[in-house]
Swiss-Prot record:
UniProt function note: Binds the lower part of the 30S subunit head. Binds mRNA in the 70S ribosome, positioning it for translation.
KH type-2 domain boundaries: 39-107
Listed InterPro entries: KH_dom, KH_dom-like_a/b, KH_dom_type_2, KH_sf_prok-type, Ribosomal_S3_C_sf, Ribosomal_uS3_bac-typ, Ribosomal_uS3_C, Ribosomal_uS3_CS
GO cellular component terms given for this protein: cytosolic small ribosomal subunit
Coiled-coil region(s): none
Name of this protein: Small ribosomal subunit protein uS3
CDD domains documented for this protein: KH-II_30S_S3 (cd02412)
Family designation: Belongs to the universal ribosomal protein uS3 family.
UniProt entry keywords in alphabetical sequence: Ribonucleoprotein, Ribosomal protein, RNA-binding, rRNA-binding
Chain positions covered by the region annotation Disordered: 212-233
GO biological process, one term: translation
Molecular function GO terms recorded: mRNA binding; rRNA binding; structural constituent of ribosome
Quaternary context: Part of the 30S ribosomal subunit. Forms a tight complex with proteins S10 and S14.
Amino acid sequence: MGQKIHPTGFRLAVNKNWSSKWFASSQNFPEMLKQDIEVREFLKKRLGHASVGRVTIERPAKSARITIHSARPGVVIGKKGEDIEVLKQELQKRLGVPVHVNIEEVRKPELDAQIIADGIASQLEKRVMFRRAMKRAMQNAMRLGAEGIKIMSSGRLNGIDIARSEWYREGRVPLHTLRADVDYATSEAKTTYGIIGIKVWVYKGELKPGQVQATPAAPEKKMRKGARNAAAN
């Protein structure tokens, strides 16, 4: 089932944590969940140029604390903190409670699955060849210490008439191993031919419950393409 299940949900409480941290009664839960989804969509549109990775939402005692993980925190904050104050006011209007916004810098954006997926989507919208964008992202991730990375693109690739999926992998990406630190994210590229979906898996090593540092594993040298395509040829 490791092939089918969401890699982050599969590893919750083992080496992954929740993106929303709050408790609500059965009556308030749907509304609060809807607010979380709307806030994430709003931040994705508003901060699309700021290389945003994760967004964590906490709700302590009639307030909200939103942590934005960004590779370009200066873009989010703005000159003298003007942009962050405007952003905070807009979030307070949406949530209806006082909001505290924290910005955390992503030290290695080349290893963040969400930033990688959004970067590839941005390149595809600028008519960059999908293979070139995927391989460039894989090379950058492996160069900066990833144990393995897998990227899949689905849709009308290069404008072909029939949609298909194509994936590449470098190193190893274990999907069944719970102690494996696998970062997973998806993104969409809106091209003139339609929407192209991108999925990214980044394997950073093995972790034991409560352990912070990853144990390096021996990477594979071969880069594989879809097995079905190879068999068909």
